[in-house]
């Protein structure tokens, strides 16, 4: 019997697609949803399943930003083949994304027992939701938001990419919340910070999904729930990306901050009352 049913996979796919790129924590919401459905959140197969369905969300990024990604890959390939083409900003930016992914990969491999064990607790999710909200508020209030995508530098990419470690270690912090907030603190405007967050998500989440695939399949999740959850997350994530880019062009992040705090308080109350298990 599969550790996750097709019906549960649909629900988790919707949650993943809605929350992966919104700064509200997909991992936190997935763990909450799993807890409410009496799915063991620290089960190896379940952890693997949640990582694999992220690939659907990443596929949505690849489709949505296909023109940008094709431009980056083309420039990178030309630069590798021809040293004279290495002055192209797209060639340089592609290397920045690769460099900026290295820290989170190293920490992810080294800290995996902690990530899959004690740090998977829903109490950690509640605390991380609050901590991430504080960072978002600070970044939104005190960042100058004056630098666009053309002003990006290697330090920007490295600092923003390294901030993904916060979400890796503390589910509830939010990968997109951490990266966008760090970008704002670096004085990027909201659209530039959000687009950088999307591009950094591609290698990080794809690698995590492929790495965890063996645990999801070998641990007792059948192919049907994996496929359904991934496909659902793709379509929902695509709509979420389009909405978020329009939203950040005109609004601050106060609505997300309020929502995160409310979810953290509600989750803490449910845990304290024994309605769900940590």
UniProtKB/Swiss-Prot annotation:
It comes from the Bacteria. GO terms for biological process: cell wall organization; peptidoglycan biosynthetic process; regulation of cell shape; response to antibiotic. The chain crosses the membrane at residues 46-66, 91-111, 119-139, 153-173, 191-211, 225-245, 256-276. GO terms for molecular function: undecaprenyl-diphosphatase activity. It catalyses: di-trans,octa-cis-undecaprenyl diphosphate + H2O = di-trans,octa-cis-undecaprenyl phosphate + phosphate + H(+). The keyword Cell inner membrane does not apply. It is found in: Cell membrane. InterPro entries: UppP. It is a multi-pass membrane protein. Its main location: membrane. One of its GO terms (cellular component) is plasma membrane. Keywords: Antibiotic resistance, Cell membrane, Cell shape, Cell wall biogenesis/degradation, Hydrolase, Membrane, Peptidoglycan synthesis, Transmembrane, Transmembrane helix. Its EC number is 3.6.1.27. Belongs to the UppP family. PANTHER family: UNDECAPRENYL-DIPHOSPHATASE (PTHR30622:SF3). Catalyzes the dephosphorylation of undecaprenyl diphosphate (UPP). Confers resistance to bacitracin. Bacitracin is thought to be involved in the inhibition of peptidoglycan synthesis by sequestering undecaprenyl diphosphate, thereby reducing the pool of lipid carrier available. This is Undecaprenyl-diphosphatase 1. It comes from Frankia alni (strain DSM 45986 / CECT 9034 / ACN14a).
